A protein has these predicted regions:
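An acidic, phosphate/nucleotide-engaging active-site surface
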Residues: 121-176
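N-terminal amphipathic/basic leader segments beginning at the initiator methionine
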Residues: 1-29
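Short acidic, glycine/serine/threonine-rich loops at helix termini
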Residues: 19-22, 46-50, 91-97, 123-133, ...
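Gly/Ser/Thr-rich loops at beta-strand to alpha-helix junctions
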Residues: 14-16, 41-43, 84-94, 177-184, ...
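Small-residue-enriched flexible segments
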Residues: 2-11, 36, 78, 154, ...
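C-terminal non-catalytic interaction/assembly regions of soluble proteins
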Residues: 293-451
């Protein structure tokens, strides 16, 4: 079980993000022990967790996964993906499993596949909540029984113990549900008895592939772990890792650049040393790992809160551009006046200016002259029909509402016909919490598939 060194090849920050195939081939020549790649995150909002769908296209995912499966076969090492299908739900793991089986069938390949399911039932989470085992993190939203029961999907982020159980099956391919970005990399060196702190530290640095180098778009990096530290080497020509690019990645999605919280403990890199190694590599030693009890896993959940339809109108009239805020207020007042005492009375309308203060709003520090502006109307209702009906109700005003009673009726422009675009279900995140567990290794379910 114990090894002196472990090499892990990370092709990209996530499956679906482009990587340099020549760099990948070069990485395979280094004889890695594992190919590991992330499959998603919550970065793209709650829709994907709520719906259990992937943000990446099926064809692109299949193309890139096919390349990685080909490289795995050449290297004769396991291929591991974490947070499969963007959100890591049961349905997205099944989606990834379907792609894997299709590729294997096309290539007439025999495989042993393990799927790690990290979903939690609403009933289980509710029981843990009632027993005080669900703990809020800083800034966590308030939760209650109704919120927990109404979550369409709840997942826990697997740590190294759960990934190691999958690795121990000697599967050719491991498809994991939601996991921490680092656990899929840290698991193998820890499994082989190497430095725990260095395993977590190296995993953090390489979680996004070549983002910790001077050429982030190149994708592929190789990590080599031992008993004292780790070395990171980019596999693309003319790409370098420097002490600065490596340490800087500790700031990425991390509130404290010296502390990294993970299942079962935390990493402290306060005393870590980053040194240039050979031509384009960086050697890192000196980080510390501290176990923490009780053992906790972060949980994520999303629930359906409505349905949305949007309409967009384009305005070029200088008078209306100058008075756009007044016009928006009048538009909103007109809408709420129309829906009063109707079945649409509970519909919410949000109006956003596009092209003027669209990102920062009142905090925008730069004032510039503009010659056109778009207004996006977002209608939120408890069903799609009401959201769409509300958009149709406001249609004439979006196109022709005048600022004052005594001026000619204006005409603006819709970029589409019909202008109403059904956005579909609206989800919101429900948790920023951890769950206390007693049996880390046996907490999730493994499913075995042979092809």
């Amino acid at each position: 079980m114990n090894k002196k060194t472990v090499k892990i090849l990370v092709p990209a920050g996530a499956l679906g993000i482009p990587f340099d195939k020549n760099a990948l081939i070069n990485g395979i020549k280094q004889k890695p022990d594992l190919i590991a790649i992330d499959g998603g995150s919550t970065d793209s909002g709650p829709y994907y967790l709520g719906s259990g769908k992937s943000k990446y296209s099926y064809s692109t995912t299949k193309r890139d996964w096919s390349i990685l499966m080909e490289m795995r076969a050449k290297a004769k090492v396991p291929l591991l993906i974490g947070t499969a299908g963007t959100c890591g739900t049961k349905s997205s793991v099944e989606w990834m499993l379907k792609i894997t089986k299709e590729i294997a069938k096309e290539n007439k390949e025999k495989l042993k596949i393990v799927a790690l399911k990290t979903d939690l039932s609403n009933k289980f989470v509710l029981e843990k909540y009632k027993s005080g085992k669900i703990k809020p993190l800083e800034g966590a939203p308030k939760i209650n029984e109704d919120i927990i029961n109404n979550c369409s999907n709840i997942v826990a982020l697997a740590g190294v113990e759960q990934i190691q159980k999958a690795i121990n099956t000697k599967a050719d391919i491991i498809i994991s549900g939601r996991s921490t970005d680092t656990a899929i990399i840290a698991s193998l060196p820890i499994y082989h008895g190497l430095n725990i702190a260095s395993a977590w530290h190296g995993a953090k640095i390489a979680e996004c592939g070549a983002l910790a180098t001077n050429n982030p778009n190149s994708g592929v990096v190789l990590l080599e772990f031992d008993h004292n530290g780790f070395t990171i080497t980019p596999m693309c020509k003319n790409t370098k890792a420097t002490p600065q690019t490596v340490f800087a990645h500790m700031l990425y999605e991390n509130a404290d650049p010296y502390i990294l919280l993970e299942p079962g403990g935390y990493l402290d890199v306060s005393n870590a040393k980053y040194k240039k190694h050979k031509k384009n590599s960086v050697r890192v030693e000196g980080s510390k790992w501290y176990n923490k009890k009780p053992y906790t896993l972060k949980i994520e959940g999303a629930r359906l809160v409505g349905f949305q339809t949007i309409s967009i109108v384009l305005i070029r009239d200088p008078k209306y551009i100058e008075s756009i805020d007044k016009w928006i207020d009048k538009l909103k007042n007109s809408f709420y006046r129309k829906i009063k005492n109707s079945i649409l009375v509970d519909v919410q309308l949000e109006l956003r200016k596009i092209g003027k203060d669209a990102t920062l709003g009142n905090l925008e520090p730069i004032s510039i002259d503009i010659n056109e502006v778009a207004v996006m109307a977002i209608f939120t209702a408890n069903n799609q029909e009401k959201a769409n009906d509300s958009a149709k109700l406001l249609n004439p005003d979006l196109l022709h509402l005048a600022l004052t009673k005594n001026e000619p009726m204006p005409t603006f422009a819709f970029p589409f016909s019909p202008p109403e675009i059904d956005k579909g279900p609206l989800f919101e995140f429900c948790f920023h919490h951890v769950i206390e567990i007693d049996n880390p290794k046996d907490f999730f379910q493994l499913q075995f598939h042979k092809i």
